[in-house]
Amino acid sequence: MSFQLPQLPYAYNALEPHISKETLEFHHDKHHATYVNKLNGLVKGTEQEHKTLEELIKQKPTQAIYNNAAQAWNHAFYWKCMCGCGVKPSEQLIAKLTAAFGGLEEFKKKFTEKAVGHFGSGWCWLVEHDGKLEIIDTHDAVNPMTNGMKPLLTCDVWEHAYYIDTRNNRAAYLEHWWNVVNWKFVEEQL
């Protein structure tokens, strides 16, 4: 069995004008594809070849396998966290975010601060941990499942996620990203 690059759940231009077609083509077809291809090369002919991405992330057989499996999973999840469909958060989700962070806008502010303030490459996440919602950032390929957390939403803060559109302005990227968050998908993760 080999791992496959999942198709985007929307057309390459579906997130415009917030995230460009060019960014999605490079990000998905080059960066994400590279992680999948490297992972296949690393696990070919080993007992790891028949495991799921989740198993490889949780078991972390080698650092190289972990990094590529986590990046493959993180990206597949990231694509689902976005849509060009203008989905708004439900009252139920807003209530949970309000209980945890003081309101939807307060959640977005705290998440943005964590994402923009992250030093270097990585990810910003909304996770469920011990029954509570938390905002965390992880470095490089680190996936929260490694620490027993359940991912609900993620934003890729590696520069390749935004450099074509906003150059080195991560804050501008986050401002655009909020316009394409797929709140329905987030709620389905709860």
Curated annotation (Swiss-Prot):
Cofactor: binding details: Binds 1 Fe cation per subunit.
UniProt keyword terms in alphabetical order: Iron, Metal-binding, Oxidoreductase
Cofactor entry: Fe cation
Chemical reaction(s) catalysed: 2 superoxide + 2 H(+) = H2O2 + O2
Thylakoid as UniProt keyword: no
Enzyme Commission number, as recorded: 1.15.1.1
GO molecular function annotations of the record: metal ion binding; superoxide dismutase activity
Residue sites binding Fe cation per the record: H27, H75, D156, H160
Highest taxon listed in the record's lineage: Eukaryota
Quaternary state and interactors: Homodimer.
Function: Destroys superoxide anion radicals which are normally produced within the cells and which are toxic to biological systems.
Family according to the record: Belongs to the iron/manganese superoxide dismutase family.
PANTHER family in alphabetical order: SUPEROXIDE DISMUTASE, SUPEROXIDE DISMUTASE [FE] 2, CHLOROPLASTIC
Protein name, entry field: Superoxide dismutase [Fe]
Lineage of producing organism: Eukaryota, Amoebozoa, Evosea, Archamoebae, Mastigamoebida
